[in-house]
Amino acid sequence: MTGMTNVTKLASEPSGQEFLVFTLGDEEYGIDILKVQEIRGYDQVTRIANTPAFIKGVTNLRGVIVPIVDLRIKFSQVDVDYNDNTVVIVLNLGQRVVGIVVDGVSDVLSLTAEQIRPAPEFAVTLSTEYLTGLGALGDRMLILVNIEKLLNSEEMALLDSAASEVA
């Protein structure tokens, strides 16, 4: 019966929006969990000539050519290391499937509207136009990224051309 009580308790708690939490350096970021298709370990990719450094290349994911973006390079991180913790979050953004390279994935958090604060007017590593806000969990701050807006910016149009070159 305790299992049933736990299910009921969880179902009756106020629901919020769920975010996949990932790390880039010392910062924690969150993206809408509904955009996440899967999480994979980092594998070598096929590099595409004449693309910015943050576009690592493309990979074949079960017959689908998926462009891979290293958010660490995109967000101007200095020390980018590929190790056992480095993962690729594969996102399904409607018309586009994209993989983003991050330092690691920690958990999935549910945030209520009260826990989400407006994005500040300044951001050092990321333009505020790509932020949906800041998630406050006690003393923990989570930078909430509008991943669709980030990956639909003009420079990301290069992803489509890179993927079509390989296809």
UniProtKB/Swiss-Prot annotation:
GO terms for cellular component: cell tip; cytosol; methyl accepting chemotaxis protein complex; plasma membrane. Keywords: Chemotaxis, Cytoplasm. InterPro entries: CheW (IPR039315), CheW-like_dom_sf (IPR036061), CheW-lke_dom (IPR002545). It is found in: Cytoplasm. Residues 16-156 form the CheW-like domain. GO terms for biological process: aerotaxis; chemotaxis; establishment of localization in cell; positive regulation of post-translational protein modification; signal transduction. It holds the Pfam family CheW. The keyword Cytoplasm applies. GO terms for molecular function: protein domain specific binding. An in vitro complex of CheW/CheA(L)/CheA(S) in a 1:1:1 ratio increases the autophosphorylation of CheA and is required for the binding of CheY, the phosphorylation substrate. This complex accounts for 10% of the total number of molecules. Involved in the transmission of sensory signals from the chemoreceptors to the flagellar motors. It physically bridges CheA to the MCPs (methyl-accepting chemotaxis proteins) to allow regulated phosphotransfer to CheY and CheB. This is Chemotaxis protein CheW. It comes from Escherichia coli (strain K12). The lineage of its organism: Bacteria, Pseudomonadati, Pseudomonadota, Gammaproteobacteria, Enterobacterales.
